[in-house]
């Protein structure tokens, strides 16, 4: 849900999954796959992207600028070495004011975008920084240079950045380190008789989902209920995927799953 909330408020702007560096390497491909089918436009780990059949996406790192020494030298080195298929998106917040480094980059190479990853301790108002950089780029004839933002972004910080003129986002920690959902597996029926420990609801339950408004309902009745909001007959939310250790439903391509998720997200109220 953390990803879906970010996707919802980002609108149609591109959003790249940057969360694998906050996760154990063994689950990085799984995290990237979940991020992609959940609505991200791309993923940043090489293995995760390969398993999705897509190229990995990202920008130049701060480490390159720090090792080269001068931002402009690093921008030119990045441009010289990277293939033409790699977007020229460079970091513009390593040493100097963001607008100064952004203009220097735009003057040095054929730039696609700048990325601002300014630490929160140095930001002040991040939306105001974005507006200032956008103004200066436009003023100096670089209207086609985008502004990609990253660094602790979530569903509360993205909306004002959209209004400020952001071109896209790299979202990591709020996806990969999202709070867990508290749940437990409990015995609720014994030989057909409902039982439960205190604080739990006894009895075998069935869950249903409305195909229109996407509402959920849990019932002990076998009768399929009508949606309380729109009146349409609901559908079982539980689908058997495996039987006797074997998958019994066809495997869907990640693109097909992502398309369905985004279609449902467009109708969902979060």
Regions from the language model: what does each represent?
Residues 1-143, 155-160:
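Buried, small/hydrophobic-residue-enriched core segments of structured protein domains
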Residues 124-145, 153-270:
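Gly/Ser/Thr/Ala-enriched C-terminal appendages of enzymes
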